[in-house]
């Protein structure tokens, strides 16, 4: 996760993170990705059930019951373990997490244990009453998925009227005083909608926007051919960055992030190096602290059946099950080959990634996407859009 707005506009500095000694337990949410101890943010797919049928859903969720999902007692035990382990954030996802009957029991326990609870939702089930419950039952932030305006969004979601319901959910959150943001997964099918979605943020006074690059997981694997090419990705990043700077000049406060393509960090650095050279060294320091892709380190996933994965896009790769061992024990067990390999990935990744001058701020990008595209977990990520000239050492990191 890369904060374009804070890095481009200079609203975060190295000193901000150092004041908290870069400890996950002490850092405020916007500085967590600069932590030194890298306690994992846990994406918890508490159910796989969902009333929509999104074409890019990494969980391949559907509107049916899934046998074997964790019981309330088991889930509360997971939360106790995560709290003891010092996990800073639990991100409730799905499926549609609001379809789990005990969701608010779980979120309340997360809050009572001193952790931050975040909700990832399609927004269609958020009525004014539900929004008030979200606020009262422990959630500090709600991310609502939008893939464009009505026609495009409804096609992506497989349901007519989904856009209207999601917008109603966003408005209900705002009216209830819940911090809410938009999550937009960009592909060739909806890249033309990006300007309109950014205008919508202004119209609806939504303070946060996350642009996700397509991960080839679940149903997303079937539309991998719709992932943006290098020039399309660069245009999207330029458009988004220009909008961030324009909002900043106007005094409009929006937090804008990109997710799941860590080449964005290098592309952002190169722009700052050209346009704000006096800030380049500090931005590079922050990007190195961020460290790029954190699968198996600073992010982990627990699925609806209790399987632990390196991230939410790697459901085919299990590290263990919380019904057999606590998450904390699994996460610290470097005898698990995959876990050790991900944390020592620099020695395993090959191709142009291996010699990239930006490896320490990208960390080889998204391994799940590389494996889906090539069958090799350690191959270069095909979503990297940097040129050979841009990644060449040592010129890449000259300031």
PLM regions: where:
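Detector for the c-type heme attachment site
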Residues: 57-63, 357-361
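N-terminal pre-core extensions flanking Radical SAM catalytic domains
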Residues: 1-61, 80-83, 327
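Radical SAM/AdoMet-radical enzyme domain recognition
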Residues: 67, 72-93, 99-235
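C-terminal accessory region of radical SAM enzymes
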Residues: 231-282, 307-363
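A structural motif corresponding to the C-terminal lobe/cap of the Radical SAM core domain
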Residues: 203, 222-254, 288-291, 376-392
């Amino acid at each position: 996760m890369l904060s374009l707005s804070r890095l481009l506009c200079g609203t975060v500095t190295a000193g901000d993170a150092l004041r908290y000694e870069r400890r996950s337990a002490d850092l405020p949410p916007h500085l967590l990705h600069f932590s030194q101890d890298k306690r994992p943010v846990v994406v918890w797919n508490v159910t796989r059930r969902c009333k929509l049928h999104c074409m890019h859903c990494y969980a391949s969720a559907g509107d049916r019951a899934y046998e074997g999902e964790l019981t309330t007692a088991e889930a509360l035990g997971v939360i106790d373990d995560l709290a003891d382990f010092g996990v800073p954030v639990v991100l409730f996802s799905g499926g549609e997490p609001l379809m789990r009957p005990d969701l608010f029991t779980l979120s309340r326990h997360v809050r009572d244990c001193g952790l931050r609870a975040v909700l990832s939702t399609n927004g269609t089930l958020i009525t004014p009453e539900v929004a008030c419950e979200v606020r009262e039952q422990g959630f500090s932030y709600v991310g609502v998925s939008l893939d464009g305006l009505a026609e495009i969004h409804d096609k992506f979601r497989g349901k007519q009227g989904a856009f209207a319901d999601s917008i109603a959910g966003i408005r209900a959150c705002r009216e209830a005083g819940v911090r809410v943001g938009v999550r937009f997964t960009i592909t060739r099918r909806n890249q033309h909608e990006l300007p309109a979605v950014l205008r919508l943020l202004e119209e609806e006074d939504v303070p946060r926007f996350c642009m996700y690059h397509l991960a080839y997981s679940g149903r997303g694997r079937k539309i991998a051919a719709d992932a943006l090419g290098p020039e399309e990705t660069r245009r999207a990043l330029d458009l988004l960055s220009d909008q961030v700077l324009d909002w900043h000049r106007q005094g409009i406060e929006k937090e804008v992030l990109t997710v799941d393509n860590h080449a964005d960090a290098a592309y952002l650095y190169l722009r700052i190096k050209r346009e704000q050279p006096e800030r380049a060294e500090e931005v590079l320091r922050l990007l190195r602290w961020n460290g790029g892709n954190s699968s198996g380190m600073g992010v982990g996933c627990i699925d609806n059946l209790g399987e632990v994965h390196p991230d939410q896009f790697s459901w085919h790769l299990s590290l263990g099950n919380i019904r057999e061992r606590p998450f904390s024990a699994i996460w610290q067990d470097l005898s698990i080959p995959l876990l050790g390999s991900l944390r020592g990935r620099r020695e395993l990744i090959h191709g142009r990634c291996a010699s990239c001058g930006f490896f320490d701020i990208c960390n080889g990008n998204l391994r799940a996407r590389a494996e889906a595209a090539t069958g090799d977990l350690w191959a270069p990520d095909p979503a990297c859009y940097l040129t050979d000239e841009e990644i060449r050492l040592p010129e890449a990191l000259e300031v």
